[in-house]
Every structure is written in C-alpha cells, then in structure tokens.
Regions:
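Short helix/strand-capping connector loops at secondary-structure junctions
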Residues: 134-146
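Structured adenosyl-cofactor binding patch, chiefly the S-adenosyl-L-methionine
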Residues: 154-171
Length: 177
C-alpha cells in the first residue's frame, strides 16, 4: 500500500517512509518520469549486482530519491541479517564482535585456518563496524539537511552493503567446542 501511495505522492515531492513518516523528495512531473526514475535506478543497481536483501530494505526510499534514508535502511539490513543468522539481539559493534570476533566466532567468512584467513575475518569485522559507525550511526543522528548523500555515493554504499550480505550469506558456523 505504501508503494502505491508513494507513486502518487512523488508528484508532490513527498514520500512515506517505512516508519510512516512523511518526508520530502524531488518531485516528478509525469508518470513516465516516475517510471523512468525507478527503471534507471533498478538498472543501475542490477548492473552492479546488488543483493536482493539490500533492495528489499530500502526500495521505497530509493524510488523517492531519498538516498539519506536508503543508506540508513540498507546498513540496518546488515545488522538484521547478522541477528537472524545468530539469534543475537545486540546491535552495532557489539553485535559484530559477538558474531564474527574472537578465536571461535559464531559466523566465519572462511576456514580461519591460516593467519591470512584470520586476518580477513578481522578485516570483515572492521568493515562492518566501520560501516555502522560511518553510515548507520551518522544517518540515525544527523539531520538529513546536514548530511548529504548523492545518488552515486548511495549506489557505491549499496554495492558495499551487497558484498556484506553475500559474505554473511556464505558464512559458516564453525564448531564452538
């Protein structure tokens, strides 16, 4: 229902977010312009191979050209996937450390049998925590008018979040003896 409302509201330069909040967006003038915007964005993201879970978390925000909130929703989708895979209820760095950190992580992105693989696991933890710190925390606390997010930057971040989703999907649950 929200998607149908947002299609109509796009002509007034408005959109309803998943939270139910009404926000401003760049207005479209014609139905073909609204369709073109959505099609171009889908094509851009499809050409990058963006993970479908990323798109499902921020579809409405992208259609409304609301890149600020699209980034927030996409990054939140990573934490949600980690919680789903592990059963943990934490958030942010604590969630990442509990799921991917230590000598016997709950989720491993590789066999953890060499120093290089252990280093890669630590690097993935740092990537996740850095992304949460830079994009989720910033967008959650900074007003949108002070924190600009261009379409190009949003697409780049969505590609990185897509990589995170693929790595989390492929992660194994090593023995925790």
């Amino acid at each position: 229902m929200r998607q149908n409302l947002n299609r109509a509201l796009a002509f007034a330069g408005l959109a309803i977010e998943a939270s139910g909040q009404l926000v401003s967006a760049s207005a479209v003038q014609t139905l073909s312009e609204a369709s073109k915007r959505a099609r171009e964005l889908r094509e851009d993201l499809a050409s990058r191979g963006v993970h479908p879970d990323v798109l499902s978390f921020c579809r409405e925000e992208l259609l409304a050209d609301n890149y600020f909130h699209a980034v927030l929703e996409a990054v939140k989708s990573v934490a949600e996937k980690i919680r789903t895979r592990t059963g943990l209820t934490d958030d942010g760095g604590v969630l990442v450390d509990r799921a991917f950190g230590g000598d016997r992580p709950m989720l491993a992105i590789n066999a953890l049998s060499t120093e290089s693989e252990k280093s890669e696991q630590k690097g993935f933890c740092n990537l996740l925590k850095g992304t949460f710190g830079m994009f989720r925390n910033t967008t959650a606390h900074a007003p949108r008018i002070y924190w600009k997010m261009s379409k190009k930057d949003a697409e780049d971040l969505l590609s990185m979040v897509s990589l995170m989703h693929r790595r989390i999907d492929a992660a194994t649950t090593p023995s925790r003896l």
